[in-house]
Amino acid sequence: MNLPKNTFKLNYITSITIVLLFLTSTVYAQSSDSEQVSYPSYSLFGFVQQQFAEDLTPGSPAGFSIHRARLGVQGKISENISFRFFGGFIEPPQSNPQLVHAYMDYKINSYLNIRAGQFLAPFGIEGNEGIILNPAIERSLTLRRLNTFRMFSDIGVQAFGSLSHFNYAIALVNGTGANRAEQIDPKDFIGRVGFNLTDGLEIGLSGHAGHYLTGQEMNEERARYRAALDVNYKGDPLFVRGELVTRKDNITNSQDVVMNGGYFLAGYKVTDRFETIVRYEHLKPNSDVDNDRLEIITMGANYYLMGRSRISVNYDFRDDKVNEDFENLFTAQLQFVF
């Protein structure tokens, strides 16, 4: 017997809430007994993003929405073992509940850590960091279209660490994305290495090799590859970041589709609470088609209330050479982080 979708969502949300309330009460009891560090230790965290969006594309009405609502728990089981569980009550684009992250880390030393579970795939900057850290309201549309993983995450194992001016993360994952069962035997290999050139300036190289299913009946196994170069300068008051990505999907034994794109973002901290940003992005969904090109210029501002909680405004000037009906987008967002 199939339960209604609303019943499933209610049970899902209720179960998460009960577990998190129990863990929160456990933390409070532990902190009351002693100020010393004890294991296991837990902390509750989460955020809500409420938006007002007006998309000038025909058939897209303006309106308010809860874009994301996430609640999670993280902590340490021992000095070397930590964990993170993060659930989304509402996740784009369908506004349905999803498991965001669920993984455990084992720290051997600063050079080598092992992670197992569902986590952000180590590729580039934007896809490899939490969305609340992005200077813009949303990750660039270019990177979202060049991304191959649902929610930029997948299930597998990862090794990561740092040494002096060098850091790395290498993972072996299913290749199907978050909350999706594996369908084929080959696994995807993905990773990034970063080099800190000076204080606040880092460059990175990323690579991804894997397989996917395609064809009318989704039963044809093909190869796909991605590579990226990123630069990130965390200056004050000026900060900049950018990524260039190329992706190649094997369609048939003799045909490949090559996609290229990237973005450049610059921001300026006017005060401790107020900053402005501008981002340029471009995408060629098929490098063999001359007029197949998308360009977007985003102008925005952030006002920080406390910590990562902020009010943001973005306006996207969008130019799609193929789809002329793809018009500009205005978005205002209240982000509350706790």
Where are these regions (language model features)?
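A short secondary-structure junction signal
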Residues: I170-A171, N179-Q183, G204, G215-E217
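Glycine- and other small-residue-rich loops at beta-strand/loop junctions that grip anionic moieties
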Residues: T148, E182, Q255
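Short, well-ordered amphipathic alpha-helices
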Residues: Q30, V193, Q333-Q335
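Outer membrane beta-barrel
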Residues: D33-G175, D185-I190, G194-E202, L265-Y268, ...
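N-terminal periplasmic/intermembrane-space "pro-region" immediately following the signal or transit peptide
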Residues: M1-P4, F8, Y12, T17-Q49, ...
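Short strand->helix junction
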Residues: T7, I90-P92, D320
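Outer-membrane beta-barrel pore domains
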Residues: L56-G59, S78, Y103-K107, R115-Q118, ...
